[in-house]
Amino acid sequence: MGRSPCCDENGLKKGPWTPEEDQKLIDYIHKHGHGSWRALPKLADLNRCGKSCRLRWTNYLRPDIKRGKFSAEEEQTILHLHSILGNKWSAIATHLQGRTDNEIKNFWNTHLKKKLIQMGIDPVTHQPRTDLFASLPQLIALANLKDLIEQTSQFSSMQGEAAQLANLQYLQRMFNSSASLTNNNGNNFSPSSILDIDQHHAMNLLNSMVSWNKDQNPAFDPVLELEANDQNQDLFPLGFIIDQPTQPLQQQKYHLNNSPSELPSQGDPLLDHVPFSLQTPLNSEDHFIDNLVKHPTDHEHEHDDNPSSWVLPSLIDNNPKTVTSSLPHNNPADASSSSSYGGCEAASFYWPDICFDESLMNVIS
């Protein structure tokens, strides 16, 4: 069924040509011409088939072959001829001097065809493509997805910058607050007694606060939190401590570790620094009942060498002299102020009326 390919013969060489083979082919054609390509290999002493010799000469060894890039005029000629002739590369090559059909075909597949597709032109019919309108929603969705991915990458980078900014603002606020506290009360105490937190400790504190807020609220943003705290500094744990009237830590330790009888008197200058928020309010029912229940009796005080630091003095003093000494106070303000610090010899004469209330005694029992 037709002629068999010449390359099927046994012993013929295939693959790239060597410079020696190229020189043999050039010398033979220059002397004798190519003649019959099927008989040329034996005459030129080449172990190749006739087709391989023809393609090698036509596409590479021919002296009139034009090398280099295609010009704009050659591109327009190829496009015009392809719209008329189609993929007939040999016919197109006859209109381009020095260009081979194989070179024109490669240039079409690698450059011109892709260029037409990008311009929205069908490379076969050379007409505008109509299938673009059918795939337009998919193209728009892909474009939107690309923009979304870019925005997500930008947002992730901004989150790292926002976290660093939050750390810096938090540390700056804490250090400024400590400096202002030192300037206002520099004569009474040192800042190390109030705030002994180094930078490493502060960073750990900030990280713990941010992680806790993220667990409670996934939408937590430390930058927005800091902006809100600028309007209300009470949200900062450190700001709450600084805004309140404070006393030195040595004085707080003195008040907490000593028994009520060892507390300084009302005129002691150490009490001037005690914040009012640390004093036990008299109108607190929970503290009042707990103190009545938990306070030991006088008999227990005789055997207790180390009374608890949080125990308040007895509401009703069993010593008649003490009760009698408290009766001359006619001013309720004086009585309440004398009982604010819980001195045993300064009990208020209002307390017995409260203690003998029947409903209150039922609760205590």
Curated annotation (Swiss-Prot):
GO terms for cellular component: cytoplasm; nucleus. GO terms for molecular function: DNA-binding transcription factor activity; transcription cis-regulatory region binding. This is Transcription factor MYB93. It comes from Arabidopsis thaliana (Mouse-ear cress). Residues 9-61, 62-116 form the HTH myb-type domain. It holds the Pfam family Myb_DNA-binding. It comes from the Eukaryota. Gene3D superfamilies: Homeodomain-like. The keyword Repeat applies. SUPFAM superfamilies: Homeodomain-like. PROSITE patterns: HTH_MYB. GO terms for biological process: cellular response to auxin stimulus; negative regulation of lateral root development. Keywords: Cytoplasm, DNA-binding, Growth regulation, Nucleus, Repeat, Transcription, Transcription regulation. It is found in: Nucleus; Cytoplasm. The lineage of its organism: Eukaryota, Viridiplantae, Streptophyta, Embryophyta, Tracheophyta. Residues 37-61, 89-112 bind DNA. Disruption phenotype: High lateral root developmental progression and enhanced lateral root density. Transcription factor that acts as a negative regulator of lateral root (LR) development. Required for normal auxin responses during LR development. May be part of a negative feedback loop stimulated specifically in the endodermis upon LR initiation to ensure that LRs are formed only in the correct place. Induction: Induced by abscisic acid (ABA), auxin and gravity in roots. Interacts with FBX5. InterPro entries: Homeodomain-like_sf, Myb_dom, Myb_TF_plants, SANT/Myb. The keyword Nucleus applies.
